[in-house]
Each structure stands twice: as C-alpha cells, then as structure tokens.
A protein has these predicted regions:
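Donor nucleotide-sugar binding/catalytic pocket of nucleotide-sugar-dependent glycosyltransferases
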Residues: 141-184, 191-193, 200-203
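Membrane-proximal helix-turn-helix segments that form the acceptor-binding/catalytic region
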Residues: 99-111, 130-150
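Acidic donor-binding loop of glycosyltransferase active sites
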Residues: 272-287, 300
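Conserved acidic donor-binding segment of nucleotide-sugar-dependent glycosyltransferases
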Residues: 316-328, 336-342
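Short acidic/histidine- and often glycine-rich active-site loop of Leloir-type glycosyltransferases
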Residues: 297, 306-321
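Nucleotide-activated donor-binding/catalytic signature segment of Leloir-type glycosyltransferases, i.e.
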Residues: 243-269
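A charged, aromatic-enriched C-terminal amphipathic alpha-helix characteristic of glycosyltransferases
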Residues: 30, 339-372
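Conserved catalytic-core segment of nucleotide-activated headgroup transferases in glycan assembly
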Residues: 190-246
Length: 379
C-alpha cells in the first residue's frame, strides 16, 4: 500500500497540509483511514492534505529521521498535522520519538499541530505500567507545549492534564471510518420481512472473549424467545478467530449468524446500512470508538454499556446505554429497540441528525480550517 497519498483534487488547492503518521498499525490502521477521509473532505474545501510517515519501525530511527529531513524541505508553507497515539511512536508505549520528531520540525520553523487520537495516557498495571503512564502524561503535556495547536478527539474539559480554557487546544471529534452514507437510510429490514439484524463489531481474544459472547447472547436471546426473527452480523477483528465459539453459543437458538471478519470500508458500510441496531459490549461506549461513529453515520440505534465517562456529543445520537455489566438491562434495551419500530426510527433519526451536524467529514474538515486559521477553544 502506498503510504503517502494525496487527497482528490478539485481544482487548484489554496492550501497544502501534511498529515504526519508514525508506525502503521496492522491489519487495519484507523489513523490512516482518519487522515484519508479528512483529506477527501478538505479537498472539497480547497485544502490538499498529503499523508506522510516516519517509518521508524521498518527503517530504524536514524534512516527514518534522515528521510524526514529530506522530505520536509517541501513543507515550508504547510501545516503539519502530527497524528499521535502512543504505539505509533514507540514499541512499548514510551513515545519519546514523537517529541523528537516534533522538535525537528519546530526547529525548522514549520507550523505544527498535534492531533491527539489518544489524549489520555494509557493506564498500566504494576511498576512498569505506572512508569509508562507517567511517561505518557509528561509527553502529552510536552507535545502540547511545543506545538502551535493541539487538536483533541475528546472534549478539552475532560482531559485532566490540560489547563482549563487553554486557547491552544481545540476539540474536534473523529469521523466515521466508512464512505459517506446515502442521505436517507430507512428501516429496510422491517419493510421487506427479513429478520431484524443486530450488528456486532469485533470480538476480543481470550480471556475476554467468553464474557463478551455471554453478554451478546444474554442480550439477543430474550428477544428471540419473544418470537422476533433475528440475525446477528459479526464483523471486524477477532470474529473469524472466534468462529467456533460463536457458532456454539448460538447453536439451536433459531438465530441466524453471519461471521464476516474484516471488511473493506464499502462493504462495512453496506453491512451497517442493512442492520437494525449496533450492539456494543466491548467495554463502555465512548466518544473515540470508531465503530460507534460509523454506526451513527449509518443511522443506527446503538445499544451498549455506559460508565461515568462524558461522551458528549456522541450522546446526541440514538443511544440506549445501560450501566456497564448489567446484562438484564442490556437485554431489555435491545428488546425495546427491536420490538418497537417507532422507537427504532426515532433513534435512527437522532443518529442521522448527529452525523449531519457533528460527525460528518465535511463538518470536521471545516472545524480544522477554523481552528488552524483562527485558534479558539472548542471544548
């Protein structure tokens, strides 16, 4: 795959920006997808976004930094949007490389913004985990201090290391990792008599897999026992590996099961558009969960767990969340959505509105332009 891609051109761009990424994640890279969709939206607004990488893992730090010094010669008038996750810049979660790269760019006089895909340090257990967490918090603060602008993917008020009302930090939510959906996507399954479809994204590896499958079964079986014809779509990482456990869990339940594995974005979009609800049991639903944003973009009701985390503006979408671990409440919430077409359509409408006004890529691209031309606090 070409690691440097230009967004589609629509005439002569008025500005040229660079999205700078670290190590590529496998088998899919959500940050690269984010930059690609952002670039497509920016192109329609006159900004050409070029994607570049510091491939320190494949080439070693010395060679990767040398190539960066050569490539950055053409970036003098550009905004550099450095994409931060801890493991994109470090093998073991000590991302000093991100600071090194930012320092090189700043010493060359380039305008640099850091896009925080992980604006909070990852929590770790034990002595090493505690040191790693403290290290990441320090690096997060230093990246913010040394950059010209910080773009947070969570509301700034929820980030405890960030000074309140910091004028250099802005909140811009992530967008969906799928192509733009049709303007109208109704409740197709209910109209053509097919079973109602519940989409489930990803299944974690053991030891979490058994609990997740128990939660999924506990949520859908009561609705099936009430006579609702059901189909479950399993897609994403881990679903093929869990094929035997999934089939055993739903054997002789009368529920149709499809295990799709990893899907390219267009097929993922189509699968979501054909679904009637998205069920999320891999922890609490939170603002930076790309699957939830994709579900919102496709106008889906989202049923899942919640904790005390502030998830605004995702809370504006069609969510039915219950306390984390409350399996009976999860089953009731899903049954309500599947049984009541009026409720389902109301939740669909809320998700569609939230997508149009908050999570659509054209809205996000406009927010970037406003932030980088007239800095102001949005969180």
């Amino acid at each position: 795959m070409n690691l440097r891609r230009d967004a589609p051109k629509t005439g002569v761009p008025t500005e040229r920006w660079v999205a700078l990424l670290g190590h590529r994640d496998f088998p899919t890279d959500g940050v690269e997808d984010y930059c690609r969709y952002l670039g497509e939206a920016l192109a329609l607004q006159g900004v050409l976004l070029r994607i570049a990488r510091v491939d320190w893992m494949g080439e070693g730090w010395l060679r990767a930094l040398w190539k960066l010094r050569l490539e950055r010669a053409g970036w003098n008038s550009s905004w550099i949007l450095m994409q931060y996750t801890a493991l994109a810049w470090s093998r073991r979660g000590f991302p000093f490389g991100a600071l090194l790269v930012l320092g090189i760019l700043r010493r060359q006089g380039l305008r640099c913004a850091v896009v925080y895909h992980e604006p909070i340090a990852l929590k770790g257990a034990g002595l090493i985990g505690g040191i790693r967490t403290a290290c990441q918090r320090w690096i997060l603060r230093e990246l913010h201090r040394q950059s010209d602008m910080s773009v947070m993917t969570a509301p700034t008020r929820t980030i405890d290391w960030l000074p309140q009302e910091d004028s250099k930090a802005v909140f811009i939510p992530i967008g969906p990792n799928i192509p733009a959906p049709p303007a109208a996507n109704g409740d197709g399954a209910a109209k053509n008599g097919k079973p109602l479809t519940v989409a489930v994204y990803c299944v974690d590896p053991p030891p979490y897999r058994e609990r997740e499958l128990q939660d999924i079964a506990g949520a859908v079986l009561p609705a099936a026992k009430q006579g609702t014809p059901l189909r479950i779509l399993f897609f994403g990482k881990g679903t093929v590996d869990a094929k035997d456990e999934i089939e055993q869990t739903f054997h002789q339940t009368g529920i149709e099961v499809s295990i799709l594995g990893l899907l390219e974005p267009g097929k993922l979009q189509q699968s979501l558009l054909e679904s009637d609800a998205l069920l999320s049991v891999r922890g609490a639903v939170y603002l930076r969960r790309g699957t939830a944003i994709a579900g919102v973009a496709c106008g889906l009701p989202i049923v899942g767990y919640a904790d005390e985390t502030d998830i605004f503006p995702l809370s504006e979408a069609g969510l039915r969340l219950v306390p984390r671990g409350d399996q009976p409440a999860l089953a009731r919430a899903l049954a309500d959505v599947l049984r009541d077409p009026n409720l389902r359509e109301d939740l669909r409408a809320r998700s569609r509105r939230a997508h149009r006004s908050i999570f659509a890529w054209d809205v996000i691209a406009k927010s970037f332009q406003e932030a980088l031309t007239k800095p102001r606090a949005l969180g």
